């Protein structure tokens, strides 16, 4: 499976160099073909390839048991109930989630910029394809709707963005943590705002290092508190990650890229009118990673849900470097760095072995 991902990744990298010169019919045909391949790869994957597929397969087969309803949303149980009328093969539900998760993301890419489709695909394949659409399949649909919601906010249709988030929460309740983006403005960042957002990211890292926690406050929220308790218990018994490294290479590089994007915010905003809200969601993702570090598994899931926006945002780096071929090459090297971490989840160390996204 990792080799198939690598093939599409390399082809997308090559096409990204001259996709602005490709006739639209060829560009969209190739993009559509890659999409079909990605859907089938997710849907027909070997059970056990990633950390979550065994659990999903078991839940699909035992959807009628009370314990299953405690582990997943009612939407998963409903879909499993319907699909079980036709087959008890878990690949049926993998295909269902892949069909909507992957196709909605590709549609979202076209809404942002149809001249950078393959560059978006490069960053999508580098991390979020494996983590969301192959592993955390419920989050796959949610994160796609999240990307669409951001676009609608930029276009002034916040009611539609709200609807996308609500629908996404139907597939994974963590979508509720995305509601604050509805209040984000999309105006170009002022100098003060740049310092504030950068300061918040750095401050969260300092608080994390000092042992700060917001667990005692969040635990009081109905339902959310129950979910937090389950995550905490899983960590205590070793079912989830027990530590999170806010000073690991992965996170520090992510912060460095955030600072770089802030520094070139004016130049990027001229080319991508989505930038102001995208950079704010990136900041939120970085903050959640450290502030929620007392429950590492939850911190990673919420953080990378917010950071799905980096598929678009990191591709904006091409607007900060001249000439274009150099810009594309640099962004693809960044994507290669993330790909090394993403493929770890399916047991394929590409460049060096890591513990995932430390």
What is each PLM-predicted segment?
Residues 134-140:
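Short acidic/glycine- and proline-prone juxtamembrane loop motifs at membrane-interface regions
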Residues 146-160:
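Membrane-interface transmembrane helices that cradle and orient dolichyl/undecaprenyl
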Residues 18-98, 341-358:
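TM-lumen/periplasm interface segments of multi-pass membrane proteins
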Residues 25, 109-126:
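Transmembrane-helix signature of polytopic, membrane-embedded enzymes
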Residues 96-112:
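Transmembrane-helix motifs of polytopic, lipid-linked glycan transferases
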